[in-house]
Regions:
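Core catalytic lobe of class I
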Residues: 1-211
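Short, conserved SAM-binding/catalytic segment
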Residues: 214-219
Length: 219
């Protein structure tokens, strides 16, 4: 199984509100767009590499927002993936909309796909149903942002909550399976994988984030 949370390329010198204070949305050079053509080339390249790595019965989860998810979804289907679900992660307490000119952004999207339409993928339907009070698990998930414990060794500007990763991993993999994260960040995917008896492999170019992930995984 692959879980990918790629750069959204949203570091555009704008501002947001965090804990009642104005903060820059810039996260680093790794999140700055080099133009639509370059972004498209970047997304397609790693999606093709992941496609080659993915086992015939494996699945991939890819995160995004409306800024990039439509492009990613198009490219995934061009590469050959078959999309299974469009998961909506709802944030219960999102940053306020400072412009007051459109609805408050309160969700992110996760595309879940298998290698091709005929592939027999893993999905623990009964487990997910049991976790949802005996009802079918829907594709809208509500999770709060990472808590303080998850940031003990430091934080990542786009860190996903551990509970979100746990649901993805538990629903679509088995004990002993290898989970790969091509954009490891703070290592949350690895923490969730190891916690539930899976193996883990991750990549991270930013040295500070690599060291953060290493500390979390060694714990």
């Amino acid at each position: 199984m692959i879980f990918a949370d790629p750069p959204y390329f949203l570091s555009n010198d704008g501002f947001s509100c965090q804990n009642g204070q104005m903060v820059s949305v810039n996260k680093g050079n790794w999140d700055k767009s080099k133009g639509m053509a370059a972004d498209l080339e970047f997304y397609e390249e790693w999606l093709r590499l992941c496609y080659a790595l993915l086992k015939p019965n494996g699945t991939i989860w890819v995160c995004g927002t409306f800024h990039n998810i439509y492009l990613i979804g198009y490219l995934m289907q061009t590469v050959g993936y078959h999309i299974l679900n469009n998961i909506t992660w709802e944030k219960p307490n999102p940053p306020p909309n400072l412009s007051c000119r459109f609805f408050t952004h309160s969700t992110e999207t996760i595309l879940w796909a298998k290698k091709n339409k005929k592939a027999k993928h893993t999905f623990h339907y009964e487990m997910m149903k049991a976790q949802n009070n005996g009802k079918q698990m829907k594709c809208v998930w509500t999770f709060p942002p990472p808590n303080k414990t998850e940031k003990t060794f430091g934080k990542h500007p786009t860190q996903k909550p551990l509970s979100l990763l746990e649901r993805c991993i538990l629903s679509a993999s088995n004990i002993g399976d290898l989970i790969f994260d091509p954009f490891m960040g703070s290592g949350t995917t690895g923490v969730a994988a190891l916690k539930h008896g899976r193996r883990f492999c991750g990549c991270e170019l930013e040295e500070d984030f690599f060291e953060l992930a290493k500390k979390r995984l060694e714990k």
